[in-house]
Swiss-Prot record:
Catalysis: reaction(s): nicotinate beta-D-ribonucleotide + ATP + H(+) = deamido-NAD(+) + diphosphate
Keyword NAD: yes
Protein name per the record: Probable nicotinate-nucleotide adenylyltransferase
Functional summary from the UniProt entry: Catalyzes the reversible adenylation of nicotinate mononucleotide (NaMN) to nicotinic acid adenine dinucleotide (NaAD).
Enzyme Commission numbers on file: 2.7.7.18
Any GO MF annotation of the entry: nicotinate-nucleotide adenylyltransferase activity
């Protein structure tokens, strides 16, 4: 089984998250996607809304038989993605995991704790985001792992590829972001 992992604050979850999840299922040869709604993001200056609220809203929004919305990081007590991946790989030895991220995250991936360990442990599926394509494609992580890049036409192989492997896919984009939703006051933490 191949499971895509979409981690994030989901503060708030929105239709853009649903869109990239559905696209990831189609493009990367995934059997399932697990949303990992994180307790917090070490790279963000302010804490998110309460986890229970974000989980409830994510579950209300993401209704798909092949997608599970989870609070796994809070349950297992991990703070960083590399730690979470190590625990999941030990806990589910028969599952092949693919880390999913928007292009905006690839652009600053080199700031993540143990980002190279992430690239070396699981394939990574990168989904285009408005305004982030060039920054992502020229980022330190993209340059460092340029030889591991799969062509977009071979994206369906990603889930069966050995790490390091990554693929950038273009897709119809939705110009939504949690940051912008919070700024409008439509979501209160």
């Amino acid at each position: 089984m191949v499971v895509g992992l979409l981690g994030g604050s989901f503060d708030p979850p929105h239709p853009g998250h649903v869109h990239i999840t559905r696209e990831a299922l189609k493009r990367f040869g995934l059997d399932r996607v697990w949303w990992l709604v994180s307790p917090g993001n070490p790279l963000k200056p302010r804490p998110p809304a309460p986890l229970a609220r974000r989980l409830a809203e994510a579950r209300r929004l993401m209704r798909h038989p092949r997608v599970a919305v989870t609070g796994l990081e809070a349950e297992i007590g991990t703070r960083f993605t590399a730690e979470t991946l190590a625990v999941l790989q030990r806990r589910y030895p028969g599952v092949r995991f693919v880390w999913l991220m928007g292009a905006d995250n690839l652009a600053q991936f080199h700031r993540w704790e143990r980002w190279r360990a992430i690239m070396e442990s699981v394939p990574v599926g990168v989904l285009a985001r408005p305004g982030a394509g060039l920054r992502a494609r020229t980022s330190p992580a993209a340059r460092r792992y340029a030889s591991a890049l799969l062509p977009e036409a071979e994206a369906a192989r990603l889930g069966r590829s050995a790490a390091p492997a990554w693929c950038f896919v273009n897709l119809p984009m939705m110009d939504l972001s949690s940051t912008e939703i919070r700024a409008t006051g439509r979501w209160r933490g």
